[in-house]
Amino acid sequence: EGGLTLIDPVMGDNGEVYSSYTPEMCTRMRELCAIADLITPNTTEAAILLGRDPVSAPQSECEAVEWMQALYEQYGASVVLTGLDYEKGKVGSGCFEGGESTVSLHERIDCYYPGTGDLFAAVMLGELLGGATLRSACVRAGEFVRDTIAYTAEQHTDPNFGVQFEKLLPRLILPEK
């Protein structure tokens, strides 16, 4: 009681349910999301939670807001929808809380690294626990993940090792200039 329950419904990405997931596991994830204060699906996971085709994804900001509102109405939790890419050359996330929505997009960096969703959720949760609003936590997490992707791409490391966020961690604890 008095805490914050964040559920990141890890079930798929890029329009596909993970091969290790069964339909029963997806049903159980829906049940888990129903007890959350905040859910953070990517567009594939949001489609699964809404009973839609996982390949479908919002094609505009208006559709993204509709999806977030539908998730809010179905699960009763605030929503952060990640992996929004309806605008050419951009990617980002949206948040929906208390009837208010915000979408934040930034320039896409043409690289893929596993674990960026986990990093996003962790940074966002840290910001929320530090007193930030959902909107500002979502924006800050998106900027941090974007910066770690850019930094990692510059290092030319094997993408299978994920993003190299450690050197950028001071940005999260030091005051912004």
Where are these regions (language model features)?
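Membrane helix-loop-helix hairpins that form the core translocation module of multi-pass transporters
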Residues: 3-13
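Glycine-rich beta-alpha junction loops
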Residues: 11-13, 45, 83-87, 107-110, ...
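Short, small-residue alpha-helix embedded
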Residues: 48, 111-134
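Short, charged, surface-exposed loops that flank catalytic or proteolytic processing sites
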Residues: 54-64, 128-139
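Short pre-catalytic strand/loop immediately N-terminal to key active-site residues, enriched for Gly-Thr
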Residues: 101-114
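A short helix->loop->beta-strand "cap" motif at the edges of active sites that frequently abuts
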Residues: 1-5, 74-77
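Charged C-terminal helix
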Residues: 135-177
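Conserved phosphate/ATP/ADP-binding segment of small-molecule kinases
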Residues: 19-102
